[in-house]
Amino acid sequence: MNRARKTSSCGCFRSAFCLLKPSTSSASEEHGDSDKKLLSVQLITPRDEEEQTSSRSIKIPPLDLNGLDCKKNAVAARRAGRRRTSEGGGVRGKGHFAEVVLDGLQRPVSLLRNQKEKSNSDDNCQEKEPTSPSSSRKKSYDNAPALESLEKLRYILHQLNSGQLPLEDLKRNIEYAALVLETAYMDETRRICDEDDDLAEVTPETVPDEVREWLAATFTRQNAGKKRDKPKFKSVANAIRTGIFFEKLFRKQQVVQCPIPPEIAELMKEVCTWSFSPFQLNEVSEGHALKYVGFELFNRYGFMDRFKVPLTALENYLSALEVGYSKHNNPYHNVVHAADVTQSSHFMLSQTGLANSLGDLELLAVLFGALIHDYEHTGHTNNFHIQSQSQFAMLYNDRSVLENHHVSSCFRLMKEDDKNILTHLTRDEYKELRNMVIEIVLATDMSTHFMQIKTMKSMLSLPEGIDKNKALCLIVHACDISHPAKPWNLHERWTEGVLEEFFRQGDLEASMGLPYSPLCDRHTVHVADSQIGFIDFIVEPTMVVCGELLVKMVEPLVSLPPTDSLFPPSVDGGDDKSPSNALSPLPDLRNSSTSPSSIRRIPLNYAGKLDIPTPWMKFLHENKAHWKERAAKEEEERKIKEAAEAEAAAKQVEENKENGVTTN
């Protein structure tokens, strides 16, 4: 009866996280060799919640939880589930089948085993000497070990099973889990629909798996994987994504620090600001702005530890990027521009709260894509390459000529062992990262600008979530053209550089007998007017859309309850216990006082409302006002010059007439 009551009271909590717990059905499992135990996995899906009393367990063969790879464990679990289903036992029908993903299960399982043994001993003690709920709860929380994210969730479940978790705390925890799942569901729904729609007409029963995989690989853009590796329940995928969310909050990154000199480290204190000056960094670092921005951000985001990036390989790769960016001695598309776009992308991720909704691989894709997005830029436009029938245009068939070269060359660089910064990524991680980076870099092709804006506006008008990859593409593209949205002293220097690059192309076009490309004739361009038009029709609409998509992606996270409500405070409020023996609460990322240097913070105002910073709007208006003043002066000067020329011409005519009369 006690077990039935416990199962009923925590069913919804288990369904939110698809929690796993060791079976306690036999005495041999309680006292036998732990290496020989069978793990019983209780699967509770939304459909099963109404039939919890009749739900069954899937028996998984003994697994070496200490030495066996987690992915192999997952495959073994899935195979065991299929065998169980085919034999007629376990879950009824296809709709009730769910795969068990055991990734990261090693420590939670061993923890629960220890906790179960401790729970049994505690239960025996309680039979002899009953204690009050408050005192037992205090003792339990004070003696809780310092656990990682998943283990903390397991510990909450253990407290619930043992009846030591207050009902109010349980309610808050369930509300929190539901909100997180709701946030994950928006993106997950779109992703799963994209995966399933392409081959929806070809059911698994009508063709063999091999033929279906060939169809997917040949006639769709989806990355076809083996069928058995694909989750069957959206709830399972949501639970996994929720686990990743908690893991991000709890993870204590042990970052391998890249070497950054003190004077450069001092400048890097401003790397989280929109007004950061890559020009100053380039001067102090003696031309190595890109390398040190790369070092700093790989440190801040923990990529060195998360993806096991070799320090030597990173230094070699960034140095090679700098060589490529300096190849054509461009006044604009150079090392400083690459550092600027990367730092601006970092601001978009870290200071708006967007990083909280992204995985580590997505964060790496954004920053890596920004680092390489103009590698070996020739200083000419795609249209110039097409019109001149350059080697690049021939190679890439006039399609995003430069962008294809940038991304292709940068991945080719990593074929050299001493520059392979992705050597420790799994095959699937590398494939996913490569696909995202290619999409991000190709989206910097200016010919795709209006299509990107139109697509994003359509997504913003719909109630569903935004396609995450398209959002990341637009963010990097916006940062690529964001110099008119920077402080005037930076914007003016960028304008001088880009126009000089245009003028050089115009000079080359004239020497080749080609017509001038727009803004490339140094004798006719009106600088102020060109920048006003660029701001009005390109940059400002892009930044407005960016602000709207950031709000839509981050706003769901604001509705999460205070993270310290996950764990009840000590009964007596004492602090005599060692911190290492107490459960620490989730970091409150919504706190407006959170350090701006944090890459995972949600900007809120004093009223607790989402307040995403948009400093670019202020600078856009200021810079446009500067250009309007300059345009007025240029127009006045032009009129004076034209009047002087007209007066000189009239005077010449008069002189000619006088000379003619005198001659006659």
UniProtKB/Swiss-Prot annotation:
Reaction equations catalysed: a nucleoside 3',5'-cyclic phosphate + H2O = a nucleoside 5'-phosphate + H(+)
**Segments for region (Disordered):** 24-60, 113-142, 564-597, 630-664
The residues the record assigns to binding a divalent metal cation 2 are: D374
Q: Where is the composition biased (Basic and acidic residues)?
A: 28-38, 114-130, 630-644
Keywords on this record? Calmodulin-binding, cGMP, Hydrolase, Metal-binding
In terms of PANTHER family, this protein maps to:
CYCLIC NUCLEOTIDE PHOSPHODIESTERASE
Q: What is this protein called?
A: Probable 3',5'-cyclic phosphodiesterase pde-1
Organism field: Caenorhabditis elegans
Q: What is the taxonomic lineage of the source species?
A: Eukaryota, Metazoa, Ecdysozoa, Nematoda, Chromadorea
